[in-house]
């Protein structure tokens, strides 16, 4: 509820200044492929959704603009070792990117753009999920002959991903984006974010996130 309220407030705030010719706002959503900066975990598929705004800066140069907004975005990674171990890290962040960009208008119905800049994010919720089945690790071993109940070699569980001695809530990073715009309303873009902060103390786990976005500008 808090997340929806923040997104709604941002949308209302942007809408209240939409009368200014230099600013327009829109909605955006898409798919993520996220991982961490180490080689231990694999990427996972997620999503993002939110609002965005573009403010033209003709006083700087024609085509230059500032892009900012608010996104609810999933990040994290996963690890699978056959059927033995399955681990998923599913953190969700409220992210605020602020990018400087340039848009080249080819004609009134088509333009290409690119932008880059920092983002700040706060972790809002998420789970660590783990599942293990070590009963098949011994091949044809009859565990009962060894006095081991095979069910004792299986287990699963989950817990909150953020908190003390867990993942840090705050993240800061850099992002780059490129895309195309149709009819001055529809945008398709691809972007990549590099987290600059360790998500866990004394680790090399920094967020990495590839996003494909679809936006509608009002």
What function would you assign to each model-found segment?
Residues 35-43, 75-92, 123-171, 203:
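Extracellular/periplasm-exposed beta-strand and loop segments of Gram-negative cell-envelope proteins
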Residues 71, 75-78, 91, 151-154, ...:
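Predominantly the C-terminal beta-signal and adjacent terminal strand-loop region
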Residues 3-12:
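Sec-dependent N-terminal signal peptides
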Residues 21-23, 43-47, 90-96, 110, ...:
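Residues that define the transmembrane beta-barrel architecture of outer-membrane proteins
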Residues 59-64, 110, 184-190:
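Repeated loop/turn-to-beta-strand initiation elements of outer-membrane beta-barrel proteins
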Residues 14-19:
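Sec/Tat signal peptide C-region and signal peptidase I cleavage site
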Residues 24-26, 32-35, 40-94:
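Glycine- and aromatic-enriched membrane insertion/assembly motifs of diderm outer-membrane
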Residues 27-31, 49-55, 70-72, 96-102, ...:
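Residues on the lipid-exposed face of transmembrane beta-strands in outer-membrane beta-barrel proteins
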């Amino acid at each position: 509820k808090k997340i929806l309220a923040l997104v709604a407030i941002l949308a209302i705030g942007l809408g209240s200044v939409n009368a200014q010719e230099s600013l327009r706002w829109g909605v955006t959503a898409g798919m993520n492929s996220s991982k961490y900066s180490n080689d231990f975990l694999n990427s996972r598929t997620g999503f993002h959704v939110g609002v965005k705004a573009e403010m033209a800066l003709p006083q700087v140069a024609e085509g230059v603009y500032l892009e900012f907004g608010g996104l609810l975005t999933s990040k994290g990674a996963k690890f699978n070792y056959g059927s033995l171990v399955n681990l998923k890290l599913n953190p969700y962040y409220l992210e605020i990117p602020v990018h400087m960009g340039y848009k080249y208008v080819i004609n009134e119905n088509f333009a290409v753009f690119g932008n880059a800049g920092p983002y700040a994010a706060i972790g809002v919720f998420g789970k660590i999920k783990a599942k293990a089945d070590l009963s098949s690790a011994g091949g044809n071993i009859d565990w009962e002959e060894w006095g081991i109940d095979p069910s004792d070699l299986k287990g699963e569980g989950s817990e909150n991903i953020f908190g003390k001695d867990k993942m840090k809530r705050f993240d800061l990073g850099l992002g780059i984006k490129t895309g195309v715009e149709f009819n001055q309303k529809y945008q398709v873009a691809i972007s990549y974010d590099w987290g600059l902060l360790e998500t866990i103390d004394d680790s090399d786990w920094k967020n990495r996130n590839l996003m494909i976005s679809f936006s509608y500008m009002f």
